[in-house]
Amino acid sequence: MNEDTTTLVEETNTTTQAALRQLSQTTPLVNAITNDVTVNQVANIILHWGGLPVMSDDVRELDEMVNAAEACLLNMGTVSETGEEAMMTAGQAASEHDAGLVLDPVGAGATATRSRVAERLSTTLDVDVINGNRGEVAALVGEDAEVRGVESVGEHPDAAETAIACAQHTEAVVVSSGVTDIVATAETAFELNVGDEMLGTLVGTGCMLGGTIAAFCGGLDDPLTAALTGTVAFGLAGEAAANGEFGEYAGPASYETTVLDAAAGTDPEMIAAVDIDNRVNRVLAEAK
């Protein structure tokens, strides 16, 4: 692990604080092609982290829109032929205009079509960060993945090794979400113990994490730093919401609103008060 990566892990708290300050100073424009189910949540989470969301998926304007953006999110939740081509167009524009590119391969492994589209997007485009659940990440490297609909089921004991293999295959930083989150490069992986089980009661938290990472990619130069600090910030917002720090909630529906409030209210001072550094650990793993 090189010196820069060691510093990033050992100083996660201060790095996350710095990332939030950078977002507030830059207000990155993020073009998100996301699914019909979660478009509102994704737009709001981008806004609450300090970004400016725009949800264009029209191929007639995507090059122009992405040219103006600092980051682009491609979410496969409601994949279609026209949607696939829109994502290809947006992804190519992101590379041409040096915008951060985040791919959420929703449902990869569930059907042959989704697996094919995910493989095309992840290997043809110059993706900076891939954000998926355990099953989706496994599917991208050809492993048997238990994905039912768009949800990952079953056990994934080799999640870190699989994430590293995915990073090598796609040349992207990989975020593999689960009970704990894995952030991987082609050389190593890190386990993040952040978040709350209440996040699992909502449809769309993975999409919201993707929107978070896209916002951080828009405000930061380094994809690994953006993936790590974005995942930490989203997890801590989920914890703060579950702990009642942003108001009481009666169940999943009101908890979702509280998560958005927590994202809007998460600032460097709040991060400074949380012991994060011992909850981010390097996983000693080699690709399979």
Swiss-Prot record:
ATP binds at residues 131, 177. Substrate binds at residues 55, 204. One of its GO terms (biological process) is thiamine biosynthetic process. Its EC number is 2.7.1.50. One of its GO terms (molecular function) is magnesium ion binding. It catalyses: 5-(2-hydroxyethyl)-4-methylthiazole + ATP = 4-methyl-5-(2-phosphooxyethyl)-thiazole + ADP + H(+). Transmembrane segments: none annotated. Catalyzes the phosphorylation of the hydroxyl group of 4-methyl-5-beta-hydroxyethylthiazole (THZ). It comes from the Archaea. This is Hydroxyethylthiazole kinase. Keywords: ATP-binding, Kinase, Magnesium, Metal-binding, Nucleotide-binding, Thiamine biosynthesis, Transferase. Belongs to the Thz kinase family. NCBIfam families: PRK09355.1. Pathway: Cofactor biosynthesis; thiamine diphosphate biosynthesis; 4-methyl-5-(2-phosphoethyl)-thiazole from 5-(2-hydroxyethyl)-4-methylthiazole: step 1/1. Its cofactor is Mg(2+). The keyword Transport does not apply. It holds the Pfam family HK.
